[in-house]
């Protein structure tokens, strides 16, 4: 797919916001994509700590409750393409139930994905939409191979791979291509050398990590 000259919306969390990079204008993955494809503009809608689904109880940091499903209405509908990259905060500290594929309410994680994809398909008709899943993380005492140990998590919480698979499966329902960064990014912060070289803390990527993400997204776009 050729997207030269496109204006692209990027909806995401702290990684899309640029936490971890030294120069957001040049090092952040969305701006790298802008340069790689000679885009006309990128609109960055990244807010750290935010989740796809609604939070059941108010967070200690109100900013974290600005969920994707609420913010999607504020995006520029004249954009030529939309990229959504999120889900890791739902895994890390979201208290919404996981739910099941086919849920339509943003009160569950699975329902939040459905809600977002449905809204985007209706409001960006015939425009490319791409979702990116969370990559692997090893953040403090939280290991993506296991359920998050954050105090907010409820009984039906799952390891990160379940959140990844829910995004992929819902993408298939809507015909929305999904880039699986969990499997295909090729970076695993469980390896100490990889963690130091590409992340600042096992979750947020540094400049080199954002270059990795941009190249993965570039290849994915070109394959469509």
Q: What is each model feature region?
A:
Residues 2, 7-9, 15-107, 111:
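Conserved SGNH/GDSL esterase-like catalytic core that processes O-acyl groups on lipids
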Residues 11-12, 132:
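Short hydrophobic segments within beta-strands
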Residues 12-13, 206:
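Conserved G/P- and acidic residue-centered "switch" motifs that form tight phosphate/ATP-binding loops
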Residues 66-224:
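Alpha-helical cap/lid subdomain in secreted, periplasmic
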């Amino acid at each position: 797919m050729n997207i030269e000259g496109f204006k692209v919306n990027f909806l995401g969390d702290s990684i899309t916001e640029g936490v971890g990079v030294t120069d957001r204008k040049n090092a952040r993955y969305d701006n790298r994509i802008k340069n790689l494809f000679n885009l006309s503009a990128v609109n960055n809608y990244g807010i750290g700590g935010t989740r796809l689904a609604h939070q059941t109880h108010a967070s200690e940091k109100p900013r974290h409750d600005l969920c994707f499903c609420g913010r999607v209405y504020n995006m520029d509908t004249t954009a030529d393409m939309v990229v959504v990259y999120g889900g890791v905060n739902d895994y890390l500290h979201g208290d919404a139930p996981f739910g099941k594929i086919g849920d339509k309410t943003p009160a569950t994680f699975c329902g939040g994905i459905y809600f977002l994809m449905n809204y985007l398909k209706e409001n960006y008709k015939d425009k490319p939409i791409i979702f990116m899943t969370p990559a692997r993380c090893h953040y403090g005492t939280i290991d993506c191979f296991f359920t998050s140990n954050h105090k907010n998590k409820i009984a039906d919480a799952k390891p990160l791979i379940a959140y990844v698979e829910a995004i992929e499966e819902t993408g298939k329902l809507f015909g929305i291509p999904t880039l699986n960064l969990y499997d295909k990014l090729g970076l695993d912060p469980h390896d100490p050398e990889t963690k130091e070289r590409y992340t600042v803390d096992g979750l947020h990527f540094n400049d080199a990590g954002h270059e990795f993400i941009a190249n993965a997204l570039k290849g994915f776009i070109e394959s469509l």
